[in-house]
């Protein structure tokens, strides 16, 4: 091989790494891999002087660009580097595995190396059965240590030296009865802690200490057999315990420790110097051993060990860090691997990337919501690679030859050479060849990835379309700032340009902004109208906004409309209302969405009502068009799809911006000044509050204030005062807003929702209000006062933080000081919680990153372990869930059930004469009576509904009737309303039969079962596996119950009055939308769950709040509570129980008694003062306060008792212990003084209780004295013993329950007679402190029965629940506690994300902490995943020591190795259909001569149109394949039917199997009113789709169609064509062989077998394409002549619109519905009717919105034969 010859780059695909095997290199392996022995500490800077040492040079000298390796003769970077090795003079410890060496030594005999366990014992195998690796070694060491401890403690039964011979009998690998071991006494080994830290093992034997160095330990480990090593968890083939001690040290190549060159100087790496030091110390030790001086040997050995240890880890506790100079520490191998900037996390898990840009962002309301404004400088620097082919060669050549933007930067040739175009003098002669790759500039319409850090959730990285603009900042639409959490105060964002078509396709299909309008976190929109656009919408739709013709025409141009609606006012001049203008933007939707939400028609224009796309009343506010669940954004997304939402947002922003530019809006000082009437009312509020505070203070001073449960008097006072002051601010805010005039700019912004609240306007104009710190008033901080300016002990409102002035007037100095105190708290919280929540989210991501949805519908991790049978227990996508659906079924009583669901039939099963009444068709009633079985079916329906009611009452968490709302994937109520408004007539009688309704609803439920994936489904669709069938039935149970109660036959007939067409449309919609809601296989739902739980945590505060005014139960909230739960903390700060009570203790009065019985109470807790008094005479006490009661007790005492008492007192101590009890606490606890006396005597009988005062005495005292006279030692002894005694005297309650508080809950009961359900208030006990085990035992009440209902009693301490009740109970409790932690801050996260997190924590049967102690201790995750989280080197060392193997299945492992992760689009493999490939049309034949088709760029525009111009455009269509279909496509320029037309594509040979999309395209001009989309990818369902829209659908689907239509660069996407475009009908000739019966497709049909791509429902006449030689016509019986004339169609010719917005008024032509029985083909020239319809088709202009709206497909179009054919 010639020196320095570079190897050619291989074109072969790299093999994928399937697994990684870890092991520790043995001595012979290190030597075999090395190229030389390193014996001299030389840098070999001058390689020429080291002749004869070539191998040594390649170890020491780093390669330069001109030099070649002396070993392999390759140049940099082809040379991989070569190892050397150092032969150590003595073995040394590897600091990374030193702890493992200690564990092994504890397991084996130090003399013979045998295992210190009897492996024949069953207990040994039982404990080691399920543990491997490090956990196994720890378990063996634990058992061996316990065995040795037992042996030494029972020496009488032992053998030699106190050790049982049993552990050495019959070990592994030995025959039965064979004897193992030497029986030697075993020293105790531990780490040596000397004056100077070192790696030495301390061995203690017979009280003599010895130091074992590595050579001694190596000798012991060398005697360990392979079988014993295997039992300890080692793999002897990978790592024997002897290999843990180093005898040979490998020297890494210079590529690992490159030198730094600067000018002519070179500086070696720190590791190089450390290796040199090791070589020097090693040589010195060898020389010292030859000299045989022990002191020198010890010193050299210690230095060698230290240098080797710090070479591996320079941050350990064994040695002081080695420094390379006075300040800088050595960066060892460990420091280079671990940490955020180490090799794993810094260079493998995350990398720096090319083709990215970063700059400041600014807002721009004139670009689309899915666009990003890119500066020219960025667009000319970033490039996109396009491969040259026959299709795009001409266009790319023009790019390459241009010298100004848009141009190209580089050309990559197939031979590997690169042409830099900027260096060419003459670029006009550049030629391109097929196969070249041109890196062209980023141009308008390119798809890029936009990101803002921190990337907390999926919506922080979204795809945008490029809009190249002037200036130097990224321009962002304001509606996109919410998911990015961005503002324009200097934020910077990152832009990434995809570098492949696959990446671009994934961006378009999954990451574009419209795809992410609805967040899976809250199942609600994360984007909406904000800021100025929201304010403009409110003012535009105000009831007194009227607009003239000039303004409305301007708006029409913005919206690309050419026909105005009829003005609301005609005289004296035409005026349009703002609501009419806003209606031009609205698609055909209804709001409120469901009938039960519909309010009565308001007279004050206060309620928004939208019907069929017309805003009838009400102003548009944030709740209507903002990012809120159930808003207009949400409804449009569910009804019409994401693209329609984008159109709506873009239209609103353009119109409102134009409106504000013309009408203006400003805020001035006059808006902040309150009038005299408002100031007077505010002053009255302040005076009223001040008097109220004074009353509370007076009541507290008089001790008459009602104390709250568990609170002291001072705490109750503070709670009442703080509550009164906060109410004062709220009341003032409401009055301030109501008194402000309607035109006040602040009020307008507040009511619109664009900025501010009523509290803000109150603080600005009136007063700021009470300032709180940590949820309470400003505390005393300066000698019993808040500030030196106030009196001592001033508890008034002014001195404790009340600010009585507003911002306009200005705060007083002390008010300003208090105000800054409250603000500082928020700043500190924000600073502290940022790091905590960021680390919390990282832990969540690591724990859940491998959890994904599998193709069988289950949820699994990387090892295919089952996490859930169904994602979220229902298998649905969180973004498709609709909340807020009322569910009144559980609250219906028997009478309401009968009125709503039951028909009029007798008990004997015969219909009464009233059946059907006025809501059933007479023919249906006659048919119903004809068959006696019909009654039975109706009875079964009612029985099923009654059973559903009972099931829902038992299973659901019931609330009030108006609050019980369901979260389901489909909103049937809205679909029913849509069906009624489009197909039904309110006055008509339904033509449906109840039996038909019941059968169709049951059929629908069976169809829903078939939508779920399962591997056990037979050919008939039935699932034969019981478990698989049950999980699907369980997922559908709640939805089926809701569906049955909504679509009960009587409700459909009587309440909805649906006809057959509307009912079949409704069922089809429900099925389709449910199918769309199923989660996608491969979805990384674990990461979504982690983001959904981690991102809202940033909105939490870190404080532990004291709920003032509610109870004194201290609860941990926010991030600390989350950390407690996720870390599975066993020492919770505020653990508590909820104790349920048996009747009658669940009533309030009895619950108070139970409260005292449960709360733990000792004598210490109720004792206020302890006195020691010398009082030897019991009859004449020296305490004056006790004389009366003592005299009373002596008088009632018998003489014998009195004499006995006197004798005891005389013999006892003269010192009396006087306990003064807290009267209030004794009263609260309901304690009897006799009980206290008995409790004292139960604990200690050495005391005489002289008196316990009677219960009716105001002062409660106890006098007690010792029975023994200790003389002078009495007082010290009493002072020592009495406090301990008081703490031990247990009066009542459960130990551990520090406080018990009453808590009321609602329990629903059912009246069996009427079936009515009512809620009753019952009382339970909330405790501070937990003792669940003791609570389960119970507490006996006054009647001698247990008062605690253990079945309903729970603790918030999850580990305690797990230990007592098992893992399932712990899972349920963990789920409940997580939800409550988020709900405390108003964060309502979708239920399915909690379940993923909780099931992952509990999946192994124990609670796995989401921390390094849980994730890195799990055996299921591989070493690569664990080391990428934390403890990098520790994990890798353990993996190598125990020979672990990583199967490379997880996300982290694949990222480390550069593989595609097996989630998402990487979960499946694609198989190429070679047969279909043979039928593909070649590129050269598919493209017309001289024409260029843009395959790579979504814009599809000419080069000149990419240059900045005044004509805006909106590219939208996706990439398509470079093939065309059999249709000839013509374009006309101009309006209303221009005269010029030119074909832009040639015809391809006709292929019947590939004409589906083309056929839909051809027929779309005629049947666009019938096009009905049911697919999320093709989102025009329910709205008339224009021909240009249908083309957009066509081009989007063309990626799946081998023969698809491709428009020229002039033809833009649907957004560039409005429905005002003209559709020109062209003639063509059809062959006679075409059949009238056309193929069709179902919603679940897949395109070309790729994935599960849903296609829209298409009427039969649109299902196939006519050949180029055919003409298509349609007639229908019963249609009018004018309607039938519109049915004549051929290829359409859309006309370009002059503006860039694609909006139109719907209903521009009547709806036509045709069945396939009325479709026929006619030969060209077969007598086409010539009449006025020709002029209509060529000069068509849309008209205003008319009552004849486009109706959804008819019932006939949803025939059963369609599904049968599918």
Curated annotation (Swiss-Prot):
InterPro entries noted in UniProt: DNA-dir_RpoC_beta_prime, RNA_pol_asu, RNA_pol_N, RNA_pol_Rpb1_1, RNA_pol_Rpb1_3, RNA_pol_Rpb1_3_sf, RNA_pol_Rpb1_4, RNA_pol_Rpb1_5
Region span, Disordered: 1660-1766
Q: Does the keyword Nucleus apply?
A: yes
| Pfam families recorded | RNA_pol_Rpb1_1, RNA_pol_Rpb1_2, RNA_pol_Rpb1_3, RNA_pol_Rpb1_4, RNA_pol_Rpb1_5, RNA_pol_Rpb1_6, RNA_pol_Rpb1_7
Give the subcellular location: Nucleus
Q: What else is known?
A: The binding of ribonucleoside triphosphate to the RNA polymerase II transcribing complex probably involves a two-step mechanism. The initial binding seems to occur at the entry (E) site and involves a magnesium ion temporarily coordinated by three conserved aspartate residues of the two largest RNA Pol II subunits. The ribonucleoside triphosphate is transferred by a rotation to the nucleotide addition (A) site for pairing with the template DNA. The catalytic A site involves three conserved aspartate residues of the RNA Pol II largest subunit which permanently coordinate a second magnesium ion.
This one is known as DNA-directed RNA polymerase II subunit RPB1-A
Q: Which organism is it from?
A: Trypanosoma brucei brucei
């Amino acid at each position: 091989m010639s020196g320095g010859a570079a190897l050619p780059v291989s074109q072969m695909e790299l093999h994928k790494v399937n697994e990684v095997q870890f092991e520790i290199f043995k001595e012979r392996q290190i030597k075999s891999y090395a190229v030389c022995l390193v014996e001299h500490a030389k840098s070999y800077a001058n390689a020429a002087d080291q002749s004869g040492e070539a191998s040594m040079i390649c170890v020491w000298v780093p390669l330069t660009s001109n030099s070649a390796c002396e070993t392999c003769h390759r140049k940099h970077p082809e040379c991989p580097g070569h190892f050397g090795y150092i032969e150590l003079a003595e073995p040394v410890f590897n600091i990374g595995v030193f702890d493992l060496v200690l564990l092994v030594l504890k397991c084996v005999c130090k003399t013979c190396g045998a295992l210190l366990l009897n492996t024949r014992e069953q207990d040994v195998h039982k404990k080691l059965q399920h543990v491997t690796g490090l956990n196994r070694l720890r378990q063996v060491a634990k058992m061996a240590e316990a065995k040795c401890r037992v042996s030494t403690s029972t020496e009488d039964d032992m053998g030699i030296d106190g050790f049982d011979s049993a552990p050495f009998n019959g070990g592994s690998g030995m025959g039965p009865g064979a004897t193992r071991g030497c029986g030697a006494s075993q020293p105790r080994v531990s780490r040596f802690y000397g004056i100077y830290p070192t790696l030495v093992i301390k061995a203690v034997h017979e009280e003599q200490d010895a130091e074992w160095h590595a050579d001694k330990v190596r000798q012991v480990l060398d005697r360990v057999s392979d079988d014993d090593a295997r039992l300890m968890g080692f793999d002897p083939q990978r790592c024997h315990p002897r290999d843990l001690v180093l005898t040979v040290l490998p020297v890494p190549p210079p590529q690992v420790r490159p030198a730094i060159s600067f000018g002519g100087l070179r500086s070696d790496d720190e590791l190089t110097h450390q290796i040199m030091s090791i070589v020097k110390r090693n040589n010195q030790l060898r020389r010292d051993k030859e000299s045989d001086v022990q002191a020198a040997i010890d010193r050299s050995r210690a230095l060698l060990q230290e240098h080797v240890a710090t070479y591996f880890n320079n941050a350990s506790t064994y040695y002081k860090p080695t420094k390379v100079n006075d300040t800088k520490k050595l960066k060892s191998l460990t420091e280079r691997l671990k940490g955020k900037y180490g090799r794993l996390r810094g260079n493998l898990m995350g990398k720096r990337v090319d083709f990215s840009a970063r700059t400041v962002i600014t807002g721009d309301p004139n670009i689309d919501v899915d666009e990003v404004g890119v500066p020219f400088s960025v667009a000319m620097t970033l490039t996109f690679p396009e491969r040259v082919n026959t299709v795009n060669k001409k266009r790319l050549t023009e790019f390459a030859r241009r010298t100004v933007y848009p141009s190209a930067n580089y050309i990559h040739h197939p031979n590997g050479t690169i042409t830099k175009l900027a260096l060419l003098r003459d670029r006009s002669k550049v030629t391109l060849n097929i196969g070249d790759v041109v890196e062209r500039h980023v141009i308008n319409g390119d798809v890029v990835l936009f990101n803002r850090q921190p990337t907390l959730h999926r919506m922080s990285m979204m795809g945008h379309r490029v809009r190249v603009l002037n200036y130097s900042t990224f321009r962002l639409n304001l509606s996109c700032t919410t998911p990015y959490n961005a503002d324009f105060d200097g934020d910077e964002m990152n832009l990434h340009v995809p570098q492949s078509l696959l990446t671009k396709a994934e961006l378009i299909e999954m990451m574009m902004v419209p795809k992410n309008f609805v967040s899976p976190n809250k199942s609600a929109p994360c984007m909406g109208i904000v800021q100025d656009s929201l304010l403009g919408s409110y003012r535009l739709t105000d009831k007194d906004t009227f607009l003239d013709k000039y303004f409305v025409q301007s708006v029409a141009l913005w919206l690309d409309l050419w026909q105005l609606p009829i003005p609301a006012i005609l005289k004296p001049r035409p005026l349009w209302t703002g609501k009419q203008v806003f209606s031009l933007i609205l698609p055909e939707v209804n709001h409120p969405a469901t009938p039960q939400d519909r309010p009565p028609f308001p007279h004050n224009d206060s309620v928004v009502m939208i019907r069929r796309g017309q805003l009838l009343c009400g102003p548009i506010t944030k709740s209507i068009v903002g990012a809120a669940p159930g808003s207009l954004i949400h409804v449009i997304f569910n009804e019409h799809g994401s693209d329609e939402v984008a159109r709506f947002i873009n239209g609103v922003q353009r119109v409102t911006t134009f409106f504000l530019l013309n009408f203006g809006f400003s805020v001035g000082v006059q808006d902040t000044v309150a009038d005299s009437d408002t100031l007077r009312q505010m002053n009255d509020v302040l005076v009223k509050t001040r008097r109220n505070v004074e009353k509370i203070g007076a009541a507290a001073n008089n001790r008459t204030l009602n104390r709250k449960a568990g609170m002291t008097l001072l705490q109750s006072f503070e709670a009442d005062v703080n509550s009164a002051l906060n109410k004062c601010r709220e009341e003032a805010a409401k009055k301030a807003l109501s008194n402000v005039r309607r035109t006040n700019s602040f009020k307008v912004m507040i009511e619109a929702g664009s900025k501010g609240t009523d509290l803000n306007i109150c603080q600005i104009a009136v007063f700021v209000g009470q300032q709180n710190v940590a949820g309470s008033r400003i505390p005393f901080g300066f000698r019993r006062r808040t500030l030196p300016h106030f009196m001592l002990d001033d508890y008034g409102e002014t001195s404790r933080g009340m600010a009585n002035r507003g911002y306009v007037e200005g705060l007083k100095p002390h008010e300003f000081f208090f105000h800054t105190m409250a603000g500082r708290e928020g700043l500190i919280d924000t600073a502290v919680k940022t790091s905590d929540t960021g680390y919390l989210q990282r832990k969540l991501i690591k724990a859940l990153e491998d959890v994904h949805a599998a193709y069988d519908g289950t949820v699994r991790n990387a090892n295919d372990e089952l996490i859930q049978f169904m994602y979220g227990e229902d298998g649905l996508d969180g973004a498709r869930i609709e909340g807020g659906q009322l569910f009144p079924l559980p609250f219906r009583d028997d009478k309401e059930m009968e009125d709503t669901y039951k028909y009029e039939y007798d008990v004997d099963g015969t219909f009464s004469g009233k059946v059907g009444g006025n809501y059933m068709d007479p023919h249906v009633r006659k048919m119903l009576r004809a068959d006696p079985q019909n009654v039975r079916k109706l009875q079964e329906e009612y029985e099923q509904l009654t059973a559903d009611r009972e099931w829902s009452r038992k299973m659901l968490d019931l609330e009030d009737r108006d609050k019980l709302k369901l979260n389901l994937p489909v909103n049937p109520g809205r679909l029913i309303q849509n069906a009624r408004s489009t197909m039904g007539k309110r006055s008509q009688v339904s033509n449906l039969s109840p039996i038909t309704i019941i059968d169709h609803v049951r059929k629908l439920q069976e169809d829903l079962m078939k939508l779920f994936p399962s591997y056990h489904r037979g050919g008939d669709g039935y699932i034969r596996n019981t478990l698989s069938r049950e999980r699907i039935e369980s997922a559908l149970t709640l939805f089926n119950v809701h569906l049955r109660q909504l679509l009960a036959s009587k409700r459909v007939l009587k309440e909805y009055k649906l006809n057959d067409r509307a009912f079949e449309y409704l069922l089809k919609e429900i099925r389709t939308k449910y199918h769309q809601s199923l989660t996608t296989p491969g979805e990384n739902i674990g990461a979504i769950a982690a983001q959904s739980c981690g991102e809202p945590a940033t909105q939490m505060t870190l404080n532990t709040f004291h709920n003032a005014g509610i109870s004194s139960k201290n609860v941990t909230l926010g991030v600390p509570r989350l950390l407690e739960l996720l870390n599975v903390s066993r020492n919770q700060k505020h653990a508590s129980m909820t104790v349920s009570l048996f009747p009658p203790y669940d009533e309030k009065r009895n619950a108070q008694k139970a409260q005292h019985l449960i709360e733990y109470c000792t004598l210490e807790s109720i004792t206020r003062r302890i006195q020691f008094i010398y009082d030897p005479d019991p009859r004449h006490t020296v305490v004056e306060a006790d004389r009366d009661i003592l005299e009373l007790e002596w008088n009632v005492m018998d003489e014998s008792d009195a004499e006995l008492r006197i004798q005891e007192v005389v013999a006892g101590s003269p010192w009396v212990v006087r306990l003064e009890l807290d009267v209030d606490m004794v009263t609260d606890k309901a304690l009897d003084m006799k009980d206290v006396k008995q409790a004292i005597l139960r604990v200690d009988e050495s005391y005489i209780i002289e008196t316990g005062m009677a219960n009716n005495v105001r002062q409660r005292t106890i006098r007690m004295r010792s029975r023994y006279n200790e003389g002078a030692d009495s007082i010290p002894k009493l002072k020592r013993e009495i406090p301990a005694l008081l703490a031990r005297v247990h009066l009542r309650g459960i130990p551990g329950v520090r406080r018990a508080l009453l808590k009321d809950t609602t329990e629903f009961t059912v009246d069996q007679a009427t079936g009515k359900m009512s809620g009753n208030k019952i009382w339970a006990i909330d405790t501070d402190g937990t003792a669940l085990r003791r609570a389960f035992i119970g507490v006996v009440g006054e009647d001698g029965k247990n008062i605690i209902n253990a079945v309903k009693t729970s603790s918030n301490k999850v580990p305690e629940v797990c230990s007592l009740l098992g893992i399932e109970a712990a899972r349920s409790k963990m789920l409940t506690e997580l939800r409550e932690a988020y709900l405390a801050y108003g964060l309502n996260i979708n239920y399915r994300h909690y379940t993923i997190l909780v099931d992952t924590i509990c999946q192994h049967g124990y609670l796995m902490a989401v921390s390094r102690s849980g994730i890195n201790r799990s055996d299921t995750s591989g070493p690569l995943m664990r080391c990428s989280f934390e403890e990098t080197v520790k994990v890798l060392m353990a993996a190598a020591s125990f020979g672990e193997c990583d199967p490379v299945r997880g996300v982290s492992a694949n990222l480390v190795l550069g593989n595609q992760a097996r989630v998402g689009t990487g979960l499946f493999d694609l198989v190429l259909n070679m047969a279909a490939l043979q039928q593909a049309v070649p590129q050269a034949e598919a493209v017309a001569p001289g024409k260029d088709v843009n395959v790579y760029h979504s814009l599809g525009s000419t080069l000149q149109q990419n240059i900045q111009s005044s004509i805006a455009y909106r590219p939208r269509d996706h990439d398509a394949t470079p093939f065309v279909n059999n249709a000839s496509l013509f374009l006309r320029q101009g309006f209303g039917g221009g005269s010029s037309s030119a074909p832009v594509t040639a015809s391809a040979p006709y292929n019947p199997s590939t004409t589906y999309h083309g056929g839909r395209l051809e027929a779309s001009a005629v049947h666009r009113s019938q096009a009905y989309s049911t697919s999320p990818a093709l989102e025009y369902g329910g709205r008339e789709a224009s021909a240009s829209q249908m083309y957009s659908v066509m081009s989007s689907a063309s990626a799946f169609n081998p023969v698809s239509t491709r428009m020229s660069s002039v033809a833009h996407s649907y957004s560039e064509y409005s429905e005002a475009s003209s559709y020109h009908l062209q003639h063509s000739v059809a062959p006679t062989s075409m059949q009238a019966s056309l193929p069709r497709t179902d919603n679940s049909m897949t395109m070309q077998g790729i994935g599960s791509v849903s296609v829209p429902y298409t009427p039969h006449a649109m299902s196939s394409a006519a050949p180029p030689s055919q003409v298509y016509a349609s007639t229908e019986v019963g249609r009018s002549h004018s309607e039938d004339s519109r049915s004549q169609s051929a290829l359409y010719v859309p006309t370009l619109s002059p503006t860039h917005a694609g909006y139109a008024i719907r209903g521009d032509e009547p709806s036509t519905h045709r069945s396939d029985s009325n479709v026929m083909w006619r030969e060209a020239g077969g007598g086409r009717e010539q009449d006025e319809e020709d002029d209509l088709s060529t000069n068509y202009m849309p008209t205003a919105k008319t009552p004849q709206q486009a109706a959804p497909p008819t019932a006939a179009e949803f025939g059963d034969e369609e599904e049968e054919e599918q």
